[in-house]
Amino acid sequence: MSKMKITNARRTNRVRTALRRTANGRPRLSVFRSSKHIYAQVIDDAKGETLASASSLEKTMRDAGNTGANIDAAKAVGKLVAERAVEKGVKEVVFDRGGYLYHGRVKALADAARESGLSF
C-alpha cells in the first residue's frame, strides 16, 4: 500500500473510533465521496443495519438534474437522507465524515441534513 492510502485509512479509523466513543447509542450519518458521486446513509451500529440512505445516483436526483459530485448534489443528498431518516423516527445522529475534511461537499451535505431536521 502507498503511504497516502495508509495515512487515509488511519485517519478514517481514528475518526470512526472517536465517533463510537461519543455516540451514546445514536445512529451515525456516514458520508462517502467519490470523484463522480456522493453517498450518505444513516447506520445503526448496535443492530448493524442501515436505517436510511441516499445518493446522487438515484432516479429522483437524476430527474431533478442534481447528479454528479458537486455541492448542489451534496445538498440534495443531505436533504433527502434527512427526510428519510426523520420518516423512520431518527432525529439525533452522529456525523461520520469518514476521514474527509469538513469542507466543500461534505459540509454542504451536513448543513442540508441539519436544515431538514437531523440534529448533530
From Swiss-Prot:
Disulfide bonds: none annotated. Keywords: Ribonucleoprotein, Ribosomal protein, RNA-binding, rRNA-binding. InterPro entries: Ribosomal_uL18_bac-type, Ribosomal_uL18_bac/euk. SUPFAM superfamilies: Translational machinery components. It comes from the Bacteria. GO terms for biological process: translation. Pfam families: Ribosomal_L18p (PF00861). GO terms for molecular function: 5S rRNA binding; structural constituent of ribosome. One of its GO terms (cellular component) is cytosolic large ribosomal subunit. This is one of the proteins that bind and probably mediate the attachment of the 5S RNA into the large ribosomal subunit, where it forms part of the central protuberance. PANTHER family: 39S RIBOSOMAL PROTEIN L18, MITOCHONDRIAL, LARGE RIBOSOMAL SUBUNIT PROTEIN UL18M. Part of the 50S ribosomal subunit; part of the 5S rRNA/L5/L18/L25 subcomplex. Contacts the 5S and 23S rRNAs. Belongs to the universal ribosomal protein uL18 family. This is Large ribosomal subunit protein uL18. The gene is rplR.
